[in-house]
Amino acid sequence: MHFHERFDVIVIGGGHAGTEAALAAARMGSKTLLLTHNIDTLGQMSCNPAIGGIGKGHLVKEIDALGGAMAIATDYAGIQFRTLNSSKGPAVRATRAQADRALYRAKIQEILQNQPNLRLFQQAVDDLIVENGKVTGVVTQMGLAFEAPAVVLTAGTFLSGKIHIGMQNYSGGRAGDPPSIALADRLRELPIRIGRLKTGTPPRIDANTINFDLMTEQKGDTPLPVMSFIGDVSHHPRQVSCFVTHTNERTHDIIRGGLDRSPMYSGIIEGVGPRYCPSIEDKINRFADKSSHQIFIEPEGLNTNEIYPNGISTSLPFDVQLNLVRSIKGMENAEIIRPGYAIEYDYFDPRDLKNSLETKSIQGLFFAGQINGTTGYEEAGAQGLLAGMNASLQVQGKESWCPRRDEAYLGVLVDDLSTLGTKEPYRMFTSRAEYRLLLREDNADLRLTEKGHQIGLVDEDRWAKFNKKRESIELELQRLRSQWVHPNSPLLEVLNPELNTPISREASFEDLLRRPEMDYPKLMSLEGFGPALEDQRAAEQVQIQVKYSGYIQRQQDEIDKAIKHETTGLPLELDYQEVPGLSNEVIAKLNDHKPETIGQASRISGMTPAAISILLVHLKRRGLLRKNPSKS
């Protein structure tokens, strides 16, 4: 049985990858179908109620710069906003928001339902139609066939998903949802390498049974950050606090006592879990010398009493979960609403993908999200947007596009996955990007929005707002460069008291702003130096571009020179333990492989470009930077 219409692009799955993929293809004019097993759960936040953070916030800003929905929905759903690393440099500053699950889901669904060229249909997909190495459509569980020359698969944790709580396990895509067994079996027939991964979630706690007075309150920032470049503080709902508490030795003893019934430690779970978001039982085992671990008590919404205790993800039996929760300060009388669990699922080796996220073996079939071995809403959303965009470009007969590593964290993400693959759930960090000073949150629109408009991802309203901001930045930079203060200028009467060293020679306003004791608001507040830009985000951009211009240019030069280090030699006797900044994982790989050149090192599976940059700096400092004649 065939559906009565043909489509250009079909997207399977309605999570963060699927929604961004469907919206991207539809924005570009492709007739798009989004298939999901349950329309009511479109945009569901399956795990933690938060968007953004270190590295992840950068991806959200890039999705937004390319016209995506995640940042907009977060502004309408965020009940606490914070800028992380605010005291550090702009490269590692990141926006994070606690989100009301219901508000976030509702906003995503509103955006989907009002998107031209997009059709929603509720049916699980059981089969792919592949003819002569090309995908031509899909078949749903009731035997209904939909035809399209491009299919984006965003199955999340649903492919042969298995949920574990203690020694009990059952099939499921997530709590309350069925797995995709038939589709998983079909995908196993494809010439793509497959593996199993694991992730988990903590028990949800009844807020009415928590004593918040015994915890440390954590308020949001003032003034409130905004996630979207076209967002506004007025979009934010009522703001609330989070709280912080800690595990203790009694907690750890309870966990150790339950490990014999842990599916992780009894060999029942075979999938590899996320290194940087371990379960509480994994933390206790890996960091046995630590007497406590921090737990963030996060509200799940304004109209629910459910609390997400970030930091105690677990698959221990329910009785152990309850005891460990009640051993924590402030939760002595806590009641669990939903037990924590682990889930195992199929993923496919992303090295079998092109950087467009199209599979190398089947034309027109694209993968995005956790199916590619990543973890996190933000990583999924970014991949979804890229896959949906490239599916649409292919249907239109145009070349695919993926940003380079020096253009976007999205480029870093895709390059890492498609080049190196992953054996564990991959999450984004700023440390994965070797050019992170160029890839800041604040300039994501300046890096990507013009390209997004050319491709068709960015609408005219966003494009107009972007051009207004970009023009104001350029004009202000020109003004600062063209206006000067001379040693005999009357402006010095108000300026010199603000400077560590008085002006003794002529200086441009730009030179003054470069001084460490001066910032843009202070300079503009002085009589004769204003007026300041009204747009605070444009003003921030002016300050960063001026103050970091030398570093930015240096990093741009590094990009231009990067390809020249292919044959740079690495001494075989080099002690990688002595190289500051290398992770233990990277040190182990280098000691195991003993590469002769930087080029060889860069191709070791799991070797990060950031680690290569660290090696180059170390070689230069030790006077060891030389070409390997045997490799020239």
Curated annotation (Swiss-Prot):
Q: Which UniProt keywords apply?
A: Cytoplasm, FAD, Flavoprotein, NAD, tRNA processing
Against Gene3D superfamilies, the record matches this protein to:
FAD/NAD(P)-binding domain, GidA associated domain, C-terminal subdomain, tRNA uridine 5-carboxymethylaminomethyl modification enzyme MnmG/GidA
User: Per the record's keyword annotation, is NAD included, yes or no?
Assistant: yes
Q: Which residues bind NAD(+)?
A: 273-287
Per the record, the domain of life is Bacteria
Describe, as the record does, how this protein assembles with itself and its partners. Homodimer. Heterotetramer of two MnmE and two MnmG subunits.
**What's the chief localization of this chain?**
cytoplasm
Q: Name one GO molecular function term.
A: flavin adenine dinucleotide binding
Q: Where in the cell is it found?
A: Cytoplasm
Record's GO cellular component terms:
cytosol
What's this protein's name?
Answer: tRNA uridine 5-carboxymethylaminomethyl modification enzyme MnmG
Give me the residues that bind FAD, please. Answer: G13, G14, G15, H16, A17, G18, V125, S180, Q370
Q: Which gene encodes it?
A: mnmG
- Record-level GO BP terms: tRNA methylation; tRNA wobble uridine modification
Q: Does the keyword NAD apply?
A: yes
